[in-house]
Amino acid sequence: MDVILLQRIKNLGKLGDKVSVKAGYGRNFLIPQGKAVAATEANTAAFEARRAELEKQEAEVLAAAQARAEQLNEVNIVITAKAGDEGKLFGSIGTRDIADALTNAGLTVDRAEVRLPNGALRHTGEFNIAIQLHHDVVAEVLVTIVSE
């Protein structure tokens, strides 16, 4: 099944690309979610008429993500947690805890945007945490974990 992408899809393509996908993926996921339209002649013509509008929307989303990244790069978060004598936490600090701490600091961050490549944080100390705001925009936040 051929579809025209209405937004960037990881490992598939970017806005306006005509790609071939399995019929179930296109019919059950991409089209109902508004991420693509079937590549018929009518849809191709309609997409070309809306291309400038869609590219403008994508540019606005990118600009908003860059503005949020500038705010996040200036923020340092301190999280207190129970820890043993050697700095090992009783439990862990995960994406939800970091997102909640950033929200309490006045910034809106979804837990899905927080990237912890090595899993949850289990020790006290300072950590640089990546916040993926857009596929092209990643902010770095310094998170300090101290024991109670």
Swiss-Prot record:
<dbReference type="InterPro" id="IPR036791">
    <property type="entry name" value="Ribosomal_bL9_C_sf"/>
</dbReference>
<dbReference type="GO" id="GO:0019843">
    <property type="term" value="F:rRNA binding"/>
</dbReference>
<comment type="similarity">
    <text>Belongs to the bacterial ribosomal protein bL9 family.</text>
</comment>
<dbReference type="InterPro" id="IPR036935">
    <property type="entry name" value="Ribosomal_bL9_N_sf"/>
</dbReference>
<dbReference type="InterPro" id="IPR020069">
    <property type="entry name" value="Ribosomal_bL9_C"/>
</dbReference>
<dbReference type="InterPro" id="IPR009027">
    <property type="entry name" value="Ribosomal_bL9/RNase_H1_N"/>
</dbReference>
<dbReference type="GO" id="GO:1990904">
    <property type="term" value="C:ribonucleoprotein complex"/>
</dbReference>
<keyword id="KW-0687">Ribonucleoprotein</keyword>
<comment type="function">
    <text>Binds to the 23S rRNA.</text>
</comment>
<dbReference type="GO" id="GO:0003735">
    <property type="term" value="F:structural constituent of ribosome"/>
</dbReference>
<dbReference type="Pfam" id="PF01281">
    <property type="entry name" value="Ribosomal_L9_N"/>
</dbReference>
<dbReference type="GO" id="GO:0006412">
    <property type="term" value="P:translation"/>
</dbReference>
<keyword id="KW-0689">Ribosomal protein</keyword>
<dbReference type="Pfam" id="PF03948">
    <property type="entry name" value="Ribosomal_L9_C"/>
</dbReference>
<dbReference type="InterPro" id="IPR020594">
    <property type="entry name" value="Ribosomal_bL9_bac/chp"/>
</dbReference>
<dbReference type="InterPro" id="IPR000244">
    <property type="entry name" value="Ribosomal_bL9"/>
</dbReference>
<protein>
    <recommendedName>
        <fullName>Large ribosomal subunit protein bL9</fullName>
    </recommendedName>
</protein>
<keyword id="KW-0699">rRNA-binding</keyword>
<keyword id="KW-0694">RNA-binding</keyword>
<dbReference type="GO" id="GO:0005840">
    <property type="term" value="C:ribosome"/>
</dbReference>
<dbReference type="InterPro" id="IPR020070">
    <property type="entry name" value="Ribosomal_bL9_N"/>
</dbReference>
